[in-house]
Amino acid sequence: MLRQFIVSTVGRRLQLPMMAQSRLASNLDKTEYTTPGEIVDYDDPPHLPVPEYPVRPDEPLEIRKQRLLYQSRKRGMLENDLLLSTFVAKHLKDFNAEQTAEYDQLINGVSNDWDIFYWATDTKPTPPQFDTEIMRLLKEHVKNHEKVQRIRQPDL
């Protein structure tokens, strides 16, 4: 169906239905213009509750590391998938119980993955509760002083 639509519109000017044109025109009035590099970051709506992440104090260290490895690779946001999976591949094996707990709090205690990205890239200041040894390690990792290509997640 889509292929037929594309083939039938090649070389022709696509005419939008009148309703779509009026909706497009009404949205143009509400467009916000930003400068290049400006971050558009809206607050979460108050009617959207953020669930509390369950603390797992009795979880064995190796199980916690396996869970954090999985959660670092499956963020739902490519930028963080690449940053966190390469960070974990490099550092997680050397973390002790306290460091893994800090990392767990960092990636699971934040309700918005964009916050982690902005803090790690120093685009926004890191709040004091997340400004830990692990965050400093992550920021150094993001700077990529070794100039390592990070276009895919490391192999398991």
Swiss-Prot record:
InterPro entries for the chain: SDH, SDH_sf, SDHAF2
SUPFAM superfamilies xref list: YgfY-like
Q: What is its main location?
A: mitochondrion
* Protein localization: Mitochondrion matrix
Keyword annotations:
Chaperone, Mitochondrion, Transit peptide
Cite the residue span of the transit peptide: 1-24
UniProt xrefs under Pfam families:
Sdh5
Naming one, the record's GO cellular component terms include: mitochondrion
Q: Which GO terms describe its biological process?
A: mitochondrial electron transport, succinate to ubiquinone; mitochondrial respiratory chain complex II assembly; protein-FAD linkage; tricarboxylic acid cycle
Record note on quaternary structure: Interacts with the flavoprotein subunit within the SDH catalytic dimer.
Any idea what job this protein has?
A: Plays an essential role in the assembly of succinate dehydrogenase (SDH), an enzyme complex (also referred to as respiratory complex II) that is a component of both the tricarboxylic acid (TCA) cycle and the mitochondrial electron transport chain, and which couples the oxidation of succinate to fumarate with the reduction of ubiquinone (coenzyme Q) to ubiquinol. Required for flavinylation (covalent attachment of FAD) of the flavoprotein subunit of the SDH catalytic dimer.
Family per similarity comment: Belongs to the SDHAF2 family.
Name used for this protein in its record:
Succinate dehydrogenase assembly factor 2-B, mitochondrial
